[in-house]
Amino acid sequence: MSLLNTPLHELDPDVAAAVDAELNRQQSTLEMIASENFAPVAVMEAQGSVLTNKYAEGYPGRRYYGGCEHVDVVEQIAIDRVKELFGAEHANVQPHSGAQANAAAMFALLKPGDTIMGLNLAHGGHLTHGMKINFSGKLYNVVAYHVDETTGQVDMAEVEKLAKESRPKLIVAGWSAYPRQLDFAAFRRIADEVGAYLMVDMAHFAGLVAAGLHPNPVPHAHVVTTTTHKTLGGPRGGVILSTAELAKKINSAVFPGQQGGPLEHVIAAKAVSFKVAASDDFKERQQRTLDGARILAERLVRDDVKAVGVDVLSGGTDVHLVLVDLRDSELDGQQAEDRLHEVGITVNRNAIPNDPRPPMVTSGLRIGTPALATRGFQAADFTEVADIIAEALKPSYDADALKARVTALADKHPLYPGLK
């Protein structure tokens, strides 16, 4: 048999075994990393299609390679669907990731040395919002804003004060670990007052926006970036939305400014995921995502959990994630992550504002509900998993008993039963 037509398990059993093991891990445990989700089978089929073979530098109707008539159709479908989904004037679906979408947007709007404002990384921001070792911190002068120590929410008075003092060229509104909604209208007002562009990074909450369960930043921002996984639940990739006025700058910054050939197989998967995101089923799933996060937050602020030094930042959540404060607990973030992993729940340790511990240890956990909602979890299931987490964070936890409860939930909601 030609190697061209040899199945993976025959051609490369080592890689196949690792893939099989990962499938088993996803099926048998509970995924609660806030940035992770499960892509529909149709999305994975599109991403694994023959479109992976096609080079297509340029844009639909304006390619530098022949034979692009079919990938042109696919890419235009993705563009049209995401524009309609979010009410955008322009969309570029070629960025390979959210980080590359952010980089391209900044390259389109800024010059090296310009000033940008973004949420401090330790207060919930993202690497690409101005971290010193990231391109954004190396190319631009960064002024960081923070959350209020009392409320745990972004301090808009500080944002306005810093903007007036530093006169940034770009203000970034968005986050990677923040449990509340942002006031996009207030951010735009401040941006207009100082002559800045407003860029919103909605990578984490784009699915909630698509479902109408979170304010849409598109009417307020000059540019909006997002990933296509996380709450959107599609393939790993990025998208840039903008005003029509900025379309040419955005497109040029992506290609040829930052990328060469687009990944048309991933763009096909994006197109499928945008169709899914417009469905009633998706909207219902996003509601369960929100409900699950609120159930979790409510369980983790009860007296029995507070008694062991565990608390919830900002007192709750408006989105798909909960940030757990372990500063008064006997556990640090790494230990808490390991303990939940022991019972079959995957989360990530996360720095919190004014964290006294180093970044690889941390004093916090970031726990999300999108993957469980995609798996079919209902309110009663989220109540059960919230109780498992609460019990696991106590000194007297019973690992075997908690793992049995996790296994029961995983068995109740089988994942990808047709995959082997």
From Swiss-Prot:
* Residues the record lists as N6-(pyridoxal phosphate)lysine modifications: K230
Q: Which cysteines are joined by disulfide bonds?
A: none
What sort of enzyme, by top EC class, is this?
A: transferase
Q: What is its EC number?
A: 2.1.2.1
Compartments where found: Cytoplasm
Kindly list the biological process annotations in GO that this record carries. glycine biosynthetic process from serine; tetrahydrofolate interconversion
Write out the entry's keywords from A to Z.
Amino-acid biosynthesis, Cytoplasm, One-carbon metabolism, Pyridoxal phosphate, Transferase
Site entry (Plays an important role in substrate specificity), positions? H229
Q: Which GO terms describe its molecular function?
A: glycine hydroxymethyltransferase activity; pyridoxal phosphate binding
Q: List GO terms (cellular component aspect).
A: cytosol
Its catalytic activity?
Answer: (6R)-5,10-methylene-5,6,7,8-tetrahydrofolate + glycine + H2O = (6S)-5,6,7,8-tetrahydrofolate + L-serine
| Main localization, broad class | cytoplasm
- Signal peptide residues are none
Which residues of the sequence carry a binding annotation for (6S)-5,6,7,8-tetrahydrofolate? L121, G125, H126, L127
Which cofactor is recorded for it? pyridoxal 5'-phosphate
The pathway where this protein functions is: One-carbon metabolism; tetrahydrofolate interconversion; Amino-acid biosynthesis; glycine biosynthesis; glycine from L-serine: step 1/1
The family database entries (PANTHER family) matched by this protein are listed as:
SERINE HYDROXYMETHYLTRANSFERASE (PTHR11680), SERINE HYDROXYMETHYLTRANSFERASE 1 (PTHR11680:SF35)
Subunit: Homodimer.
So what does this one do?
A: Catalyzes the reversible interconversion of serine and glycine with tetrahydrofolate (THF) serving as the one-carbon carrier. This reaction serves as the major source of one-carbon groups required for the biosynthesis of purines, thymidylate, methionine, and other important biomolecules. Also exhibits THF-independent aldolase activity toward beta-hydroxyamino acids, producing glycine and aldehydes, via a retro-aldol mechanism.
Q: Provide the family line.
A: Belongs to the SHMT family.
What is this protein's name?
Answer: Serine hydroxymethyltransferase
